UniProtKB/Swiss-Prot annotation:
Changes after translation: Predicted to be exported by the Tat system. Not glycosylated.
Catalytic activity: an L-alpha-amino acid + O2 + H2O = a 2-oxocarboxylate + H2O2 + NH4(+); L-asparagine + O2 + H2O = 2-oxosuccinamate + H2O2 + NH4(+); L-methionine + O2 + H2O = 4-methylsulfanyl-2-oxobutanoate + H2O2 + NH4(+); L-phenylalanine + O2 + H2O = 3-phenylpyruvate + H2O2 + NH4(+)
InterPro entries given in the database record: Amino_oxidase (IPR002937), FAD/NAD-bd_sf (IPR036188), Flavin_monoamine_oxidase (IPR050281), TAT_signal (IPR006311)
GO cellular component, one term: cytoplasm
Keyword Cytoplasm on entry: yes
Family named by the database record: Belongs to the flavin monoamine oxidase family. FIG1 subfamily.
Protein name: L-amino acid oxidase
Practical applications according to UniProt: Can be used for the preparation of D-amino acids by resolving racemic amino acid mixtures and for the production of alpha-keto acids.
Cofactor: FAD
Enzyme Commission number(s) from the entry: 1.4.3.2
Oligomer status and interactors: Homodimer; non-covalently linked.
GO biological process: amino acid catabolic process
Length: 534
């Protein structure tokens, strides 16, 4: 294969991460400019239907999560009569915030009651919002106050197993990054100086790259990484002649073989890069705000849908609420029920649609929150937000982004997915807690086991009305990768008067943004259809 500038930059990105590659590209004048794509959604205006379309038009929305409530909110702006049917007793669906008073019985029959102190909580579901997501636009429109979310913190730890002396050792992100970037910069600079890139880069290019690498890796004058203040201090600099004592770097071979840099690219991601945001008081604040705008008289909580059928008058939905069987017929229906659960309803959907719904496979994910009566992560580890990462089943430990310097706080003791979450799924809450504490203490020490006031956990595969964290499309590896599966495309089409919406029908699966954009798309299609049929 020809060795080109493009292949060189691609390899640089694979080994050093997007930050290293992009920095080098900028230095060489190769980095492209970026521009946000134009938004095409046009919100419906108040009175869009009045005096323009004959008669009234009604929509029944199945599900009071992000897609369902957003659909109802936008449709009401134009004068549609909307009824939302939600099986739970709260809005938000998989956007679920556990706080004092929360109670949940899972599919195993175990009931948990949350006893966190007033003002303390954690988000069992969605917890962060990227700057690019329209979720922030709705926070603005609905008056939901937001605050910064610590998605990355140089003081949190990485702890991985390997065949090196770093195996099972907790290393701060700042130290891991300083050593990894330092040694990589040293090796790349050496390769550049020895002529390995002569067929790719001009003399001026190499000079610019060497200058960049010297700065990026904090290299010595002779191009070596000898350590850096970037990795932290054993004793902090102070007054007078107290210059501090820098932490010594790990050996190059240990750093490379240990894989301590395996998670650095996480916050390079378009939807994970700082700044990130979250609502003050919990993510569910957004959906209580939607509820207030829509009106509780237009939302039926505790409504378990049993049937959804196209009929001559539109769509008839049957459900149970308060121990009684009820039904509603509307001109249109928007179904936001998780796709793998729709087939359980009595329905008259075509076979190919039912097959398409089954192609959206459920996934495993869960969290456990521990309330500590002492914020040891701040006072002892100097950690204010962010997450420690590990290859243990707990995957990561997320620290509070609020109530700084107070006397207590809720730590998310694990946020795991896939096979790692399956290790927790069949356990009782007490067993989950014990496992989380045992693994967490191997990262943060014995203090992790003390001063525990209460705890609460959630596993989405075991949660009624969800039975999944998010959808993975069969044959697509869980994401579309620029091309949709036939089953996915099938569900983008209405079945007579029934429309489907949700994050599973977006290119932002598992994000609120995905559900909200899907809802907007369906609202637009319904409104255009009503106008055309008038």
């Amino acid at each position: 294969m020809a060795f080109t500038r493009r292949s060189f930059m691609k390899g640089l990105g694979a080994t050093g991460g997007a930050g290293l590659a992009y920095g080098a590209m900028s230095t060489l004048g190769l980095a492209p400019s970026t521009a946000a794509p134009a938004r095409t959604f046009q919100p419906l205006a108040a009175g869009d239907l009045i005096g323009k379309v004959k008669g009234s038009h009604s929509v029944v929305v199945l599900g009071g999560g992000p897609a369902g409530l957003c659909s109802a909110f936008e449709l009401q702006k134009a004068g549609y009569k909307v009824t939302v049917l939600e099986a739970r007793t709260r809005p938000g669906g998989r956007v679920w915030t556990a706080r004092g008073g929360s109670e949940e019985t899972d599919l195993s029959g175990e009931t948990q009651k949350c006893t966190f102190s007033e003002g303390h909580f954690y988000n069992v579901g969605a917890t962060r919002i990227p700057q690019s997501h329209i979720t922030l636009d709705y926070c603005r429109e609905l008056g939901v106050e937001i605050q910064g979310f610590g998605n990355q913190n140089a003081n949190t730890f990485v702890n991985y197993q390997s065949d090196t002396s770093l195996s099972g050792q907790s290393v701060t992100y700042r130290a891991a990054k300083a050593d990894t970037f330092g040694y990589m910069s040293e090796l790349l600079k050496k390769a550049t100086d020895q002529g390995a890139l002569d067929q790719v880069l001009s003399r001026e290019d190499k000079d610019a790259l060497s200058e960049f690498l010297s700065d990026f890796g904090d290299l010595s004058d002779d191009g070596r990484y000898l350590g850096s203040s970037r990795r932290g201090y054993d004793s902090e600099p102070g007054a007078g002649l107290n210059f501090g004592t820098e932490k010594k770097p790990f050996a190059m071979q240990e750093v490379i073989r240990s894989g301590i840099g395996r998670n650095f690219s996480f916050d390079f991601g378009y939807d994970q890069a700082m700044m990130m945001f979250t609502p003050v008081g919990g993510m569910d604040r957004i959906y209580y705000a939607f509820q207030d705008r829509i009106g509780t008289d237009n939302i039926v909580f505790g409504a378990e849908v049993t049937s959804m059928k196209n009929v001559s008058e539109g769509v008839t939905v049957e459900y149970t609420a308060g121990g009684s069987k009820k039904s509603i017929t509307a001109d249109y229906a928007i179904c936001t029920i998780p796709p793998h659960l729709v087939g359980r309803l009595q329905n008259n959907l075509p076979g190919d649609v039912l097959t398409a719904l089954k192609a959206a496979k459920p996934s495993s994910s869960g969290k456990l929150g521990i309330e500590y009566s002492r914020r040891w992560w701040e006072t002892e580890d100097r950690i204010y937000g962010g997450a420690s990462n590990t290859d243990k089943d707990i995957s990561q430990i997320m620290f509070p982004y609020d109530h700084y310097n107070s006397d207590r706080g809720v730590v998310v003791a694990y946020y795991s997915s896939g096979k790692r979450q399956e290790a927790f799924e069949s356990l009782t809450h007490r067993q989950r807690l014990a496992k989380a504490i045992a693994e967490g203490s191997e990262i943060h020490g014995e203090k992790y086991t003390r001063d525990i006031s209460s705890s609460f956990s959630g596993s989405w595969r075991r949660t009624k009305y969800s039975e999944s964290a998010w959808a993975n499309w069969a044959g697509s590896g869980g994401s579309h990768g620029g091309a949709a599966t036939p089953e996915y495309e099938k569900l983008l089409e209405p079945v007579d008067k029934i429309y489907f919406a949700g994050d599973h029908l977006s290119n932002a699966i598992a994000w609120q943004h995905g559900a909200l954009t899907s809802a907007r798309d369906v609202v637009t299609h319904i409104h255009e259809r009503v106008a055309q049929e008038a």
